[in-house]
A protein has these predicted regions:
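Active-site cores enriched in adjacent His and Asp/Glu residues with nearby glycine-rich loops
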Residues: 17-33, 179, 183-228
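A composition/biophysics-driven feature that prefers long, compositionally simple stretches
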Residues: 1-187
């Protein structure tokens, strides 16, 4: 059993019969007519699926025996992929997430509607995290509000509380990932020290660090580097 499946089982163990959880990875935000800001997937979605692409959704529904575990992804469009890059295929999504039931994202709303209509749904969990009162609603918050309007008799619960508590205690896979990240960071800092000399600029040392960690397999830095 892969770590994402183990985490989903822990979530399902906490859902009462008649409860469901819906998580969205989010959507990219356009920065211009032909470009978008760098996409950051919802962390809870990634925690339960291992996937970081936009326009995906996960439905966990303890409304049936056995419980529903369904992943929704974007349908590949070859002409678009020339400009946006390859999309995850159904087989790839199954392999990464360990979820057997993978469908295309345009069917997620109808699935939720059928689940509500045909099964006993008393409460629905969405990621309703808000850092401050003035914050713009996240994509998941927007979906939660829309769900509440469409199904006012179903209680809305915050998945953020449950999932944040789970993520505070690292499992074996997370510990191994952290140890690898620490080792890569160490090598990056050693390169910074080895190349440091009078006259070098901060942005040059930033480039040395990021080159080293990327050459060792890091996808990116965890936080933006503060360098002048």
């Amino acid at each position: 059993m892969n770590p994402y499946e183990q985490r989903r089982r822990r979530v399902l163990d906490q859902l009462q019969f008649g409860e469901m959880m819906v998580l969205y990875s989010g959507e990219s935000v356009a920065s211009s007519m032909d470009e978008g800001f760098e996409f950051e997937a919802n962390h809870h979605f990634f925690y339960l699926t291992g996937l970081r692409r936009e326009n995906m959704a996960l439905v966990l529904a303890n409304t049936h025996h056995p419980a529903h575990v369904i992943l929704f992804i974007e349908e590949p469009i070859p002409d678009m992929e020339r400009w946006t890059g390859r999309r995850v295929t159904i087989d790839e999504a199954k392999a990464v997430s360990g979820i057997d039931d993978v469908r295309y994202i345009d069917s997620v709303e109808s699935l939720i509607s059928r689940c509500v209509a045909r099964e006993t749904v008393e409460a629905a969990y969405f990621d309703c995290y808000r850092n401050a009162m003035g914050d713009t609603d996240s994509y998941n918050m927007q979906k939660a509000k829309r769900f509440a309007q469409q199904y006012p008799t179903i209680a809305l619960k915050n998945a953020h509380t449950m999932l944040s508590a789970m993520r505070m205690v690292k499992d074996e896979d997370e510990i191994k990932t952290l140890e690898r990240a620490i080792a890569i960071t160490d090598q990056g800092l050693r390169r910074v020290l080895a190349t440091l000399e009078p006259g070098r600029m901060e942005y040059q040392q930033q480039a040395e660090f990021e080159y080293e960690i990327r050459m060792r397999g890091a996808e990116r830095v965890s936080f933006p580097t503060i360098a002048g």
